[in-house]
Amino acid sequence: MTKSELISKLAERFPQLLAKDAELVVKIILDAMAKSLSRGERIEIRGFGSFDLNYRPSRVGRNPKSGEKVHVPEKYVPHFKAGKKMRELIDSGPKQHKVLDRVTG
């Protein structure tokens, strides 16, 4: 699902919400999440999952085209861990998803 598909689903689910307002809501949520992660904060959405940062130390990499060794600096990368309810939903298979789509709209 893309950001635009999420905005469309949100606007469909809540007809009183204009598409531009749905877009603003999604943008505000994603911006808040990105800012929290950039401050090193953990994000937890119960039933959905959690986002945190994993540290990657500096290392010597290789340019795949030339074979030349290059220094790759240390960095933090975002990491998502699915929550229990999300894992159960995924494990239930596509058949169950179709039932949930009918129920949730």
Curated annotation (Swiss-Prot):
Keyword annotations from UniProtKB, A to Z: DNA recombination, DNA-binding, Transcription, Transcription regulation, Translation regulation
Top-rank taxon, per record: Bacteria
Gene3D superfamilies (UniProt xref): IHF-like DNA-binding proteins
The keyword Transcription regulation appears for this protein: yes
Function: This protein is one of the two subunits of integration host factor, a specific DNA-binding protein that functions in genetic recombination as well as in transcriptional and translational control.
UniProt family annotation: Belongs to the bacterial histone-like protein family.
Name the record gives this protein: Integration host factor subunit beta
Encoding gene per record: ihfB
